[in-house]
């Protein structure tokens, strides 16, 4: 079923890791952990496990950037199978919120990326129709999705000779999210001209042309979307929905009645509590939604009523991507030391935000049930899972029935030397080391503890003739990609940052990592974090780590000891098999991301003191995204209003 394509065979620790993980799955182990050092080929090991077991797989990553990186690698390994990408379709998302202390209601505000919507639909269709599928997803995949049974029921099955009118098919297409258009230019559209119906599904590159003879299907074929020439004639075809959330007429009517019943109960509760204003507000808002649902089958914020459409009881878990898979889906949780805490926290953050909306009459209590899975619910839905990390967390060690180490790198690369240097004259020493790196055509990463320090250090490096970039620690997928491009291309020699220099940065050009304030104990200087930072330079033959500190903390010592242990294992392997280490040569695969994300490039150098309005607008947008991600809704709303005002000014200036 799966056909793995690669120019190389498993080597080093990979063969034993693959064998043990496969055997563990066959024995029925629910939880296993793969401890794979940077550059040991963890993705290749995962691909081999999938290929050997021939089971559909879900690979969950902690963020969009890592997910896109994994997606590109799996596409390379499985060119003849379906590899799909499933992440949040929002480029920007500010959720609905209410701030009671200021009586401030903030409406939901979002920018939807149509390309990502279509990729999600492609993933759902593949999972429901075939077994040879790998879906690479972010942790947002545990958020509520549509009912898979509705997704199956609402498709359109056509065959030659079937008695059905073209107008009936067109009406059904509209019900499952397709838009009627005079031109078939984007996915999710259809066109009806006479007896010819043309459809451009969201989940495939070819269009579908259906010719009718009266009210009978006469011919079905796929066609090229560019030159419109026929590709393949078919006897039958199934057309799947263009949107995730589809429902039947019966379910819609049932949901409307169920919402009315909940509204009556909630209004009684609020009035008994003396909350007359809240009751009036809730009645007005909900009745307006019900009118739209009855007339159009849709209303803004319809996701808040998902429990009524699904027929779930209060508190029952929502449908998610996991429910679309067969029961034997194999799940990998990449960078699990980050992903596990994320999965634990997502439900709490969502519940906290909705609490004030429900209490103050903006939403019915059923809004609580439009949510991500709790961590416990996630584990119940997953039949078997493999945690993957260079530094697994306590949970992984606690539950795993088998822990597999993958220390040896096929390239022979050895973990970098770690050197502790005093903080006195640390900046001068650092500049000297960076200049040595630059002379070799390599790059440097510097990690500090505060944004202010990062900015000042970056500016000083520029003054000293080093092309340096200062980056915020909270970057969205697009912004991080731009940084990766500039650093890997050599547009800059060094990047100074905070938390961003940890997991997932695949930068073989980097040969120096400097860790300032290494002895300041805390989350950013824990053993796990230090090992992750050290790993950023493990893909380069000249890899070196400088820890600037006045004392060696227990976390530093454990990180250094673990690094030295891994160095020893790799050096013994290299000597035994006569391997000469070589720096990893890896082409820029940024175009994978650019296919999905459409945003103007943003310059993060931020050294210009006099900003143009366009530059100021970019900075405001960046700050707005960050405020929303940190649940600072009031700040995000103020920034949004300022952005709208500035955009209007720019429109007026361009007009003049």
From Swiss-Prot:
Annotated binding of ATP, by residue: 36-43
Limits of the UVR domain: 614-649
GO biological process, one term: nucleotide-excision repair
Keyword Repeat: no
Subcellular location per the Swiss-Prot or TrEMBL entry: Cytoplasm
Keyword ATP-binding included in the entry's annotation: yes
Main localization of the protein described in the UniProt heading: cytoplasm
Domain-level remarks: The beta-hairpin motif is involved in DNA binding.
Self-association and partners: Forms a heterotetramer with UvrA during the search for lesions. Interacts with UvrC in an incision complex.
Family in the record: Belongs to the UvrB family.
Protein's job: The UvrABC repair system catalyzes the recognition and processing of DNA lesions. A damage recognition complex composed of 2 UvrA and 2 UvrB subunits scans DNA for abnormalities. Upon binding of the UvrA(2)B(2) complex to a putative damaged site, the DNA wraps around one UvrB monomer. DNA wrap is dependent on ATP binding by UvrB and probably causes local melting of the DNA helix, facilitating insertion of UvrB beta-hairpin between the DNA strands. Then UvrB probes one DNA strand for the presence of a lesion.
Protein name (database record): UvrABC system protein B
Lineage: Bacteria, Thermotogati, Thermotogota, Thermotogae, Thermotogales
Gene (name only): uvrB
């Amino acid at each position: 079923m799966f056909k793995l394509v690669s120019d190389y065979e498993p080597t080093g620790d990979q063969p034993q890791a693959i064998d043990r993980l496969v055997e563990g799955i066959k024995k029925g182990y629910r939880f296993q952990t793969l401890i794979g050092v940077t550059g040991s080929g963890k993705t290749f090991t995962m691909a081999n496990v999938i290929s050997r077991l021939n089971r559909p797989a879900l690979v969950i990553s902690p963020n969009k950037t890592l997910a896109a990186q994994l997606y590109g690698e799996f596409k390379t390994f499985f060119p003849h199978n379906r590899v799909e990408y499933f992440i949040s379709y929002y480029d920007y998302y500010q959720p609905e919120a209410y701030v009671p202390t200021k009586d401030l209601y903030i409406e939901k505000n979002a920018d939807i990326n149509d390309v990502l919507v279509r990729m999600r639909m492609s993933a759902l269709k593949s999972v429901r129709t075939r077994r040879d599928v790998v879906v690479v997803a972010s942790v947002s995949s545990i958020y509520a999705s549509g009912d898979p049974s509705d997704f199956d029921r609402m498709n359109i099955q056509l065959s030659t000779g079937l008695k059905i009118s073209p107008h009936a098919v067109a009406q059904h297409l509209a019900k499952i999210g397709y838009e009627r258009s005079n031109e078939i230019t984007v996915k999710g559209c259809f066109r009806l001209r006479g007896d010819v119906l043309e459809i451009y599904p969201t989940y495939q590159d070819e269009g579908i042309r259906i010719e009718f003879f009266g009210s009978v299907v006469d011919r079905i074929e796929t066609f090229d979307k560019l030159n419109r020439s026929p590709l393949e004639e078919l006897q039958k075809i199934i057309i799947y929905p263009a949107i995730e959330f589809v429902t039947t007429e019966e379910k819609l009517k049932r949901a409307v009645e169920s919402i009315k019943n909940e509204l009556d109960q909630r209004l009684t509760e609020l009035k008994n509590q003396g909350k007359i204003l809240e009751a009036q507000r809730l009645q007005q808002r909900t009745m307006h939604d019900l009118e739209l649902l009855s007339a159009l089958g849709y209303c803004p914020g319809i996701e808040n009523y998902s429990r009524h459409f699904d027929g779930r009881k209060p508190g029952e878990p929502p449908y998610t991507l996991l429910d679309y898979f067969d029961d034997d889906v194999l799940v990998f949780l990449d960078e699990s030391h980050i992903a596990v805490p994320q999965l634990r926290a997502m439900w709490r953050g969502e519940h906290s935000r909705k609490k004030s909306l429900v209490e103050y009459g903006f939403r019915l209590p059923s809004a609580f049930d439009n949510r991500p899975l709790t961590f416990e619910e996630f584990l119940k839905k997953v039949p078997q899972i493999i945690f993957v990390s260079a530094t697994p967390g306590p949970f992984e060690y606690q539950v795993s029935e088998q822990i597999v180490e993958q220390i040896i790198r096929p390239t022979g690369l050895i973990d970098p030397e770690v050197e502790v240097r005093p903080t006195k004259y640390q900046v001068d020493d650092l500049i000297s080391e960076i200049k040595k790196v630059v002379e070799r055509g390599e790059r440097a990463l510097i990690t500090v503890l505060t944004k202010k320090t990062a900015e000042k250090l970056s500016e000083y490096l520029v003054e000293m003739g080093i092309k340096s970039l200062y980056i915020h620690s909270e970057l969205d997928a697009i912004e991080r990609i731009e940084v990766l491009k500039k650093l890997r291309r050599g547009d800059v020699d060094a990047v100074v940052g905070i938390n961003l220099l940890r997991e997932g940065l695949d930068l073989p050009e980097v040969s120096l990592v400097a860790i300032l304030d290494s002895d300041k104990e805390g989350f950013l200087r824990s053993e796990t974090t230090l090992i992750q930072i050290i790993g950023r330079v493990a893909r380069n033959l000249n890899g070196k780590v400088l820890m600037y500190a006045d004392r060696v903390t227990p976390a530093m010592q454990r990180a250094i000891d673990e690094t030295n242990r891994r160095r020893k294992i790799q050096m013994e392997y290299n000597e035994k098999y006569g391997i000469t280490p070589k720096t990893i040569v890896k082409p820029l695969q940024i175009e994978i991301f650019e296919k999905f994300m459409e945003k103007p490039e943003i310059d993060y150098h931020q050294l210009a003191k006099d900003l143009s309005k366009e530059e100021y607008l970019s900075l405001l947008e960046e700050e707005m995204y960050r405020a929303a991600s940190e649940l600072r809704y009031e700040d995000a709303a103020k920034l949004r209003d300022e952005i709208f005002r500035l955009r209007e000014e720019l429109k007026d200036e361009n007009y003049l």
